[in-house]
Amino acid sequence: MGQALGLVQVDQSTVAIKESFGKFDEVLEPGCHFLPWCIGKQIAGYLSLRVQQLDVRCETKTKDNVFVNVVASVQYRALAEKASDAFYRLSNTREQIQSYVFDVIRASVPKMNLDDAFEQKNEIAKAVEDELEKAMSMYGYEIVQTLIVDIEPDEHVKRAMNEINAAARLRVAANEKAEAEKILQIKRAEGDAESKYLAGLGIARQRQAIVDGLRDSVLAFSENVPGTSAKDVMDMVLVTQYFDTMKEIGASSKSSSVFIPHGPGAVKDIAAQIRDGQLQAKLI
């Protein structure tokens, strides 16, 4: 009805291309416009000024001969002041942008190894954006932003990369575990050494106390029982120690100690060996 009356509506973020007898006349801004169609005025088409997005998937090969799919996302929009160029000069904007993306990616990625391509995604995106901006500005389009969304290697390469990463992580974990075991063993050895040191001090003090006690016993027995010599007292002490030892060994049913020689007569031999050792020490 509006067109029949010569009225046309242009929506927000949109411009209309007005022609007069097939020739470009002017760009109509959003709003209501009078269009006298009876004198050859008409709308050739509408052009959106909204930001549009185009995702481009490009297959190429890296410097180390790995085939990858590079996914680029290009955001672009038509410029209102160059609406006539954007409308008339390009027949298929998306295909034109895609061609430039292919060209830049296939010129950049083959110069990089696969790992470098992952690290330099921003540099690739910047190269694509610069080339697009330079090429598309003459056609009335602005490149808002360009992103390299993903770099997808071949499935076999991806599996190999995952295995390499897994092996590296396992190696780090093994090293950490070995280091922890090493520290644990060192601490255990230090604790064992300290324990043995303290045990040695305890044994030394115990034996010192035994020696002091035996000395006091020998002196007291010799003073209180006339006619006894130190030898008689030592023999009696050794017999007492023998029976105490046998009692301690037999007190436990699970004892693994073996007393050799075990006969009572062996006490005499032990005493003789002690005396002989003392005599030899004095002679030396």
Swiss-Prot record:
<keyword id="KW-0472">Membrane</keyword>
<keyword id="KW-0519">Myristate</keyword>
<keyword id="KW-1003">Cell membrane</keyword>
<dbReference type="InterPro" id="IPR001107">
    <property type="entry name" value="Band_7"/>
</dbReference>
<dbReference type="InterPro" id="IPR050710">
    <property type="entry name" value="Band7/mec-2_domain"/>
</dbReference>
<keyword id="KW-0449">Lipoprotein</keyword>
<dbReference type="Pfam" id="PF01145">
    <property type="entry name" value="Band_7"/>
</dbReference>
<protein>
    <recommendedName>
        <fullName>Hypersensitive-induced response protein 1</fullName>
    </recommendedName>
</protein>
<dbReference type="GO" id="GO:0005886">
    <property type="term" value="C:plasma membrane"/>
</dbReference>
<comment type="function">
    <text>Positive regulator of hypersensitive response (HR)-like cell death. May be involved in potassium ion channel regulation.</text>
</comment>
<comment type="subunit">
    <text>Interacts with LRR1.</text>
</comment>
<dbReference type="InterPro" id="IPR036013">
    <property type="entry name" value="Band_7/SPFH_dom_sf"/>
</dbReference>
<feature type="lipid moiety-binding region" description="N-myristoyl glycine">
    <location>
        <position position="2"/>
    </location>
</feature>
